[in-house]
């Protein structure tokens, strides 16, 4: 049975649209995902009130029965409060969102690991350290080969053509080593956000010897800070098997969320092949 995953990112409470926030909740209630993943940037400026709003949102999702896996983003680290930024960069995140910076979810068909890439020194860019790379390999080594292995970060591990004018966007710090660790761990799907752009492609097409991962980027789910004329959106993923991933981008239309582009990716042992899904009716 396929695992149904809603992948949201960059919800940015403090620069959000309340109507769109309510729209995500309505859509999730209707579709009933097995897991909700939020890949960072819960707030706009890591302020207490913004974290309280984000916490209330998560509490509503959990009260509705949804399992939630979350990682922080760079906006969840204080920008202007320099003392807090360096002394306790994620204290508010841990208090209001989650104390777990390497969350794990596993069921009969998928294993999901979240990794924190937000740092004090990098301002907007992220970083991954060697202990985290080792953890990726360690956690997935114990997973059954039949399960789909999914890695979640805020900052992408791969440089993709999603920057201004579609130039290559910056990858996370130490990404060369991180990609090797992901390859050794046998990760099938890498989820991230950060750039407020949707994108999906085989890692191998972006980085030589990147292994067999499928890279899936989420746009911003609820922020008013839109880029490249992309409306608010999130990803609706069906992991049928580790080599059979269905991706639908769910897009805000001004009054609610509706299904957008729909592709099914199949791995043939060498490449991920994309096949558009034609909706009936």
Q: In which residue ranges do the predicted regions lie?
A:
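Beta-strand-turn-beta hairpins that frame and shape the catalytic cleft
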Residues: 1-6, 103-114, 144-148, 209-214
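Mobile, glycine- and charge-enriched loop segments
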Residues: 1-18, 128, 132-172, 265-281
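N-terminal active-site segment of His-dependent metallophosphoesterases
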Residues: 1-60, 80, 101
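Active-site neighborhood of phospho(di)ester-bond hydrolases with catalytic His/Asp-centered motifs
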Residues: 8-9, 36-41, 67-74, 116, ...
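Active-site environment of divalent metal-dependent phosphoester hydrolases
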Residues: 14-19, 44-47, 71-82, 120-124, ...
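Extended active-site neighborhood of metal-dependent phosphoesterases/phosphodiesterases
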Residues: 53-138, 143, 181, 236
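Conserved beta-sheet core of the metallophosphoesterase superfamily
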Residues: 166-242
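A short C-terminal boundary segment appended to hydrolase-like catalytic domains
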Residues: 238-281
């Amino acid at each position: 049975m396929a695992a149904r995953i809603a992948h949201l990112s960059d919800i940015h409470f403090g620069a959000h649209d309340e109507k769109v926030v309510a729209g995500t909740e309505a859509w999730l209630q209707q579709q009933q995902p097995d897991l909700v993943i939020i890949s960072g940037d819960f707030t706009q400026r890591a302020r207490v009130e913004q974290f309280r709003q984000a916490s209330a949102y998560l509490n509503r999702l959990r009260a509705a029965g949804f399992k939630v896996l979350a990682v922080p983003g760079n906006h969840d680290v204080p920008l202007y409060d320099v003392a807090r930024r360096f002394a306790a960069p994620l204290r508010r995140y841990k208090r209001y969102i989650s104390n777990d910076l390497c969350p794990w979810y596993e069921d009969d068909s998928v294993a999901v690991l979240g990794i924190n890439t937000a740092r004090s020194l990098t301002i907007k860019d992220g970083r991954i350290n060697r202990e985290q790379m080792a953890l990726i390999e360690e956690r997935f080594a114990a997973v059954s080969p039949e399960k789909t292995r999914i890695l979640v970060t805020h900052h992408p591990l791969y440089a993709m053509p999603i920057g201004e004018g579609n130039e290559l966007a910056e990858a996370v710090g130490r990404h060369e080593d991180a990609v090797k660790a992901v390859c050794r761990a046998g990760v099938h799907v890498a989820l991230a956000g950060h750039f407020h752009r949707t994108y999906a492609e085989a890692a191998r097409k972006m980085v030589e010897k990147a292994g067999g991962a499928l890279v899936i980027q989420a746009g911003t789910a609820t922020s008013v800070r839109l880029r490249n004329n992309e409306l608010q959106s999130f990803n609706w993923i069906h992991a049928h098997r580790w080599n059979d991933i269905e991706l639908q981008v769910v897009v805000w239309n001004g009054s609610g969320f509706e299904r957008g582009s729909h592709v099914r990716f199949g791995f043939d042992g060498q490449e991920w092949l994309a096949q558009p899904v034609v909706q009936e009716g």
